[in-house]
UniProtKB/Swiss-Prot annotation:
Role noted for this protein: Degradation of thiocarbamate herbicides.
Gene coding for it: thcB
CDD domains reported in the protein's UniProt record: CYP130-like
Enzyme class: oxidoreductase
UniProt keyword annotations, A-Z: Heme, Iron, Metal-binding, Monooxygenase, Oxidoreductase
Pfam families: p450
Superkingdom assignment: Bacteria
Cofactor(s) recorded in Swiss-Prot or TrEMBL: heme
Family of this protein: Belongs to the cytochrome P450 family.
Induction and repression of expression: By EPTC (S-ethyl dipropylcarbamothioate).
EC number: 1.14.-.-
Binding positions for heme per the UniProt entry: 375
Protein name: Cytochrome P450 116
Length: 437
């Protein structure tokens, strides 16, 4: 049911009346897009689980409820996680069909027991020791991009640094050959609006074309990597797992993780790091602290992920009749679980709206999920954020936000990061002599 406003007397599927607050909830515009966690402050207090007629979803806002949903996949299935939240137009479906687009299951939307079997076999490249081997390359790429703007005195952190670098790192991690990185970069950002947004028909048509082209390209890349016995990266590892376990991994599965992996490893890190820089620079004393003492950066990262994470909400489907926060959810009921709201729940985080890099339990945020579906790439994302903050704070500690700028975000339910973060500094004051004009 998709309406701008719930009609008079509308009820949830369980027959309960829908409150005015629930009827007015619109995740595609207004308060949720400005600040999703603050927009649900009243809901956390008065109506922590409510039915949204606009979405046809139950919205869950409190920490403990969301934690239990994550940890009970036998009751709350992840199967709808990457379903389009806005129905796909016939024209867009035809376009996708012309590319033989066949989206299937990936780790993010798989049920047990196959999820755990596949995750165990695909996990090795994500283990901390293996991810750590990428740090010198990440640092090299970050500094290469910083070199391009360091003497200018002004930059857009997103356009000049945070968009490109995570994309390059993601593709290196996946095992994409150097000559294909530029093509992957062009196609890799199609998914957010299409899957989690509210695109118009024209937008669906445009994005479907890009997604179809990338789907074809992803399949060709898998074939290319299969033919290279010396290829390194996550996709070559998955190809080897297919050789050893053909019953668990077919070609469509490999194409799906190539297709989805670019998005998962790229955009979420771009958004998380953009949010972190904005938050730290708006809280100047915290920025100055990490510039003076870089050992504080890991704690600052956890607080940034809690306070303004890039993954705002996930979705689940009730497998059986169940209850969340004393609200009955019928089998088949769909839930939007808003981690951004959970991360501001004062039952878990005292003074939750205060940004505090010394917070003792910031790492208990739910931005990366919890349980068997914890984000597979969390270690890589944290490493990239650490290197970004270390290098920028070392070379541009005097950097500040351009005054008066307005921050914009792509309207969608689940992912959040500023489209631009404009900063400025006096290049004559750059602490590294070689960085001065």
């Amino acid at each position: 049911m998709t309406v701008d406003h719930a009609p008079e007397g509308v009820k949830s599927p369980t027959g309960c009346p829908v409150s005015g607050m629930a009827a007015d909830f619109d995740p595609f515009r207004g308060a949720y897009q400005v600040d999703p966690s603050s927009s649900l402050r009243q809901a956390r207090k008065d109506e922590p689980v409510f039915f949204s007629p606009l979405l046809d979803y139950w919205v869950v806002t409190r920490y403990e409820d969301i934690k239990q949903i994550f940890k009970t996949p036998s009751v709350f299935s992840p199967s709808i996680t990457v379903d389009q939240i806005t129905p796909i137009s016939d024209e867009a479906l035809q376009i996708l069909g012309s590319y033989q687009f066949a989206a299937g299951r990936m780790l993010v939307n798989e049920d047990e027991p196959i999820h755990t079997e596949r995750r165990r076999l695909l996990m090795q490249p994500f283990e901390a020791d293996n991810v750590a081997t990428l740090e010198p390359k990440i640092r090299e790429v970050v500094n290469t991009y910083l070199d391009r703007v360091i003497k200018d005195g002004r930059a857009d952190l997103i356009g000049d640094l945070l968009y490109e670098v995570p994309c390059i790192v993601a593709l290196i991690f996946l095992g994409v050959p150097d000559e294909d990185i530029e093509t992957c970069r062009q196609y890799g950002m199609q998914q957010t609006l299409f899957t989690w947004g509210h695109p118009t028909g024209d937008e669906q048509t445009r994005v479907a074309t890009g997604m179809g082209k990338f789907w074809e390209f992803a399949g060709g890349l898998v074939d290319k990597l299969k033919a290279d016995p010396n290829a390194k990266g996550w996709i070559p590892h998955a190809i080897e797992m297919q050789r050893q376990h053909p019953d668990l991994f077919d070609d469509n599965y490999l194409q799906n993780i190539m297709f989805g992996g670019v998005f998962a490893a790229h955009e979420t890190t771009t958004n998380a790091t953009g949010n972190a820089f904005r938050t730290l620079l708006e809280n100047r004393s915290s920025w100055d602290e990490i510039c003076a003492d870089p050992t504080l950066i890991p704690k600052a990262i956890e607080e940034c992920l809690r306070y303004s994470g890039s993954v705002v909400a996930w979705r689940r489907k009730a497998v059986v009749d169940t209850t969340v926060g004393e609200v009955d959810i019928p089998a088949g009921g769909r839930l939007l679980i808003v981690m951004a709201s959970a991360n501001r729940d004062d039952s878990m985080f005292p003074e939750p709206d205060d940004f505090d890099i010394h917070r003792g339990n910031a790492q208990r945020h739910l931005t990366f999920g919890i349980g068997s579906h914890t984000c597979l790439g969390a270690t890589l994302a944290r490493l990239e954020m650490k290197v970004f903050l270390e290098e920028v704070s070392r070379r541009l500690p005097h950097m500040s936000l351009v005054a008066g700028q307005e921050f914009s975000y792509l309207p969608n339910t689940s992912f959040r990061g500023p489209e631009h973060v404009l900063v400025e500094w006096d290049p004559q004051q750059n602490p590294v002599p070689a960085d001065r004009p």
